[in-house]
C-alpha cells in the first residue's frame, strides 16, 4: 500500500500545479491593475517631443540690408559722439597746459645796457638758458668784419648776427653737445668750449672744433636807448 500512496500523492500534486499557476497569474494581473496611482499626470497624453517656442512675431520684418544699414548708422553715430568728446577733452587739456599771461611776461628779460662796460661780457639767465651779452670794442667789431665768410663752417657775416655792432647777444650753449663756453678764451679771442674744444670768434661763429654751427642768436630788441629786451 505504501507505493500506491506515494504514487497517488505525486499524481495529486501534478494535477494541482496548473491550478496554482492560474491563481498566480490572476494575482499578478490584479496587483498590476491596483498598482496604478490615482494621481493623473498633467503630461498624460502629451507628445514626448519638446515644443520650441516660436519667436517669429518678434523678429524684424525688414530685409537684411535695412538691418545692416541701421547697424552701420548706429556705429557711425557712436563713433562721432566719441570723437567729439575726445576733441573737447584734448582742447581743454591743452588750454590748461598753455602758458598764462604772467608766464609769458616772465619769458621776456630786460637788461640795462648802461651797466655793462665796453669790452666786457655779461651772462644772464633766460628761459633756463645762459645768454651772453658782449659790449664789443671798435677793434673787435673791425676784426669780426674782416673774416672771409667763405672759409667759415657756418657762413654768416657779422652784420647778420647783430642789430647794433657794439652789442653781441647770443645763447651761451655750445652747438655741439650743449656745454657752456668760456668767454674771452680760445684761439680766436671769443669763446671756448671746455667740453670738446670748440672755438668761437668775437662774433660767436664756430671756427675750430666739433661744433657744427655758430652760437644761436635769440629774439631781442632795443626798445629804447640803453635798454635790451630778450624774448
Swiss-Prot record:
Q: Could you say which EC number(s) this protein's record lists?
A: 7.1.1.8
Q: Which reaction does it catalyse?
A: a quinol + 2 Fe(III)-[cytochrome c](out) = a quinone + 2 Fe(II)-[cytochrome c](out) + 2 H(+)(out)
Which GO-annotated molecular functions does the record name?
2 iron, 2 sulfur cluster binding; metal ion binding; oxidoreductase activity; ubiquinol-cytochrome-c reductase activity
Tell me which SUPFAM superfamilies the record gives: ISP domain (SSF50022), ISP transmembrane anchor (SSF81502)
Q: One Pfam annotation, family name?
A: Rieske
The record's family statement is: Belongs to the Rieske iron-sulfur protein family.
**UniProt source species:** Neurospora crassa (strain ATCC 24698 / 74-OR23-1A / CBS 708.71 / DSM 1257 / FGSC 987)
What does the note accompanying the cofactor annotation read?
Binds 1 [2Fe-2S] cluster per subunit.
* Subunit annotation: Component of the ubiquinol-cytochrome c oxidoreductase (cytochrome b-c1 complex, complex III, CIII), a multisubunit enzyme composed of 10 subunits. The complex is composed of 3 respiratory subunits cytochrome b (cob), cytochrome c1 (cyt-1) and Rieske protein (fes-1), 2 core protein subunits pep and ucr-1, and 5 low-molecular weight protein subunits qcr6, qcr7, qcr8, qcr9 and probably NCU16844/qcr10.
Show which residues sit on the Mitochondrial matrix side of the membrane.
Answer: 33-65
Transit peptide: give start and end: 1-24
- What is the name of this protein? Cytochrome b-c1 complex subunit Rieske, mitochondrial
One GO CC term, this protein: respiratory chain complex III
Q: Which cofactor does it need?
A: [2Fe-2S] cluster
- What is the top EC class of this enzyme, as a single word? translocase
Instruction: List each copy of the Rieske domain by range.
Output: 134-229
Question: Using the chain's own numbering, where are the disulfide bonds?
Answer: 179-195
Q: What is known about what this protein does?
A: Component of the ubiquinol-cytochrome c oxidoreductase, a multisubunit transmembrane complex that is part of the mitochondrial electron transport chain which drives oxidative phosphorylation.
Q: Which residues cross the membrane?
A: 66-95
- Please give the residue ranges for the topological domain Mitochondrial intermembrane: 96-231
Q: What else is known?
A: The Rieske protein is a high potential 2Fe-2S protein.
Processing after translation: Processed by both the mitochondrial processing peptidase (MPP) and the mitochondrial intermediate protease (MIP). Initially, MPP removes 25 amino acids from the newly imported precursor in the mitochondrial matrix. This proteolytic processing is then followed by a second proteolytic cleavage by MIP, which removes an octapeptide to generate mature-sized Rieske protein.
Q: Where in the cell is it found?
A: Mitochondrion inner membrane
Please list the residues that make up the propeptide.
25-32
Q: Which NCBIfam families match?
A: Rieske_proteo
